[in-house]
Amino acid sequence: MSHNFHVIIPARYHSSRFPGKLLQEINGITVIERVYRQALLAEPKSVIIATDHDEIADRAIQFGAEVVITSHTHQTGTDRIAEVVAKGSFAPDDVIVNVQGDEPFIRPKLIQQVACSLTKTKAPVSTLCWPISSLQILNNPNVVKVVCTRDNHALYFSRSAIPFHRDDKNAYSNTFRHIGLYAYRAAFLLEFVSWPPCALEQIECLEQLRILWSGFSIRVDEACEEPLQDINTKEDLILAQQYFLDTFNV
């Protein structure tokens, strides 16, 4: 049974920290194919890989994926999936889920959750978070933190430790890390990428701040399952390969 949403996977080859990571293999299967397989398990209406790289496109076609070739000038994955939406026959209210191409173990239930959340809110965007479990994670600028209202809408995203525990600098209770999984209404996605970057976004290097700065809300739900590590470095790839061996007893 398919669900009423579409998945688009932005697949960039020239990652700054680990170029070509999507074509690296985990037990004989490329990272991008593993992401694609996980997305299919969420049972969306469609799964599309958006890329500007010939080898990624060729590999994706070989394993049966629908591929859209996009511009090489895009600065973000959101810009890339917006091009796919602009080229396609999507309705304005269609739900588009942006699944990052470097998450080979993305949980299908999280994809379903973020899509379902968008259908139950007036916010034009939904995303997920997870409780922070250590001071090290809280203080890591590569981990994006989020604080929310009582009705689960984002107040702010930051690379800094928020909220700041004034009376106990070693505390991390009631802190949450953002999970970079988004669902958008198709029409809003196209509107969003037409806006120029805002100052806050440029300071933090977090494009979702453009949405808040522009006066729109982002629904944020706690993930129904703990998210697994994405792949940003060669060390992450080694950990992912070991995780696969440990989990599946290969």
From Swiss-Prot:
User: Which one of the record's GO molecular function terms can you name?
Assistant: 3-deoxy-manno-octulosonate cytidylyltransferase activity
Disulfide bond entries:
none
Q: What is its main location?
A: cytoplasm
Which keywords label this protein?
Answer: Cytoplasm, Lipopolysaccharide biosynthesis, Nucleotidyltransferase, Transferase
Single GO cellular component term: cytosol
Q: Which InterPro entries match?
A: Cytidylyl_trans (IPR003329), KdsB (IPR004528), Nucleotide-diphossugar_trans (IPR029044)
At the top level of its lineage, which domain of life is listed?
Bacteria
Pathway given for this chain reads: Nucleotide-sugar biosynthesis; CMP-3-deoxy-D-manno-octulosonate biosynthesis; CMP-3-deoxy-D-manno-octulosonate from 3-deoxy-D-manno-octulosonate and CTP: step 1/1; Bacterial outer membrane biogenesis; lipopolysaccharide biosynthesis
Q: Coiled-coil segments, which residues? A: none
**Has UniProt tagged this entry with the keyword Transferase?**
yes
What does it catalyze?
A: 3-deoxy-alpha-D-manno-oct-2-ulosonate + CTP = CMP-3-deoxy-beta-D-manno-octulosonate + diphosphate
Q: Which SUPFAM superfamilies match?
A: Nucleotide-diphospho-sugar transferases
- From the Swiss-Prot or TrEMBL record, state where the protein is found: Cytoplasm
The EC number(s) attached to this protein equal: 2.7.7.38
Question: Looking at the keywords, is Nucleotidyltransferase present?
Answer: yes
User: What is one Pfam family matched by this protein?
Assistant: CTP_transf_3
Concerning its family, UniProt says: Belongs to the KdsB family.
Q: Which PANTHER family match?
A: 3-DEOXY-MANNO-OCTULOSONATE CYTIDYLYLTRANSFERASE, 3-DEOXY-MANNO-OCTULOSONATE CYTIDYLYLTRANSFERASE, MITOCHONDRIAL
Q: What is this protein called?
A: 3-deoxy-manno-octulosonate cytidylyltransferase
| Source species of the chain | Legionella pneumophila (strain Paris)
**Encoding gene, per UniProt annotation:** kdsB
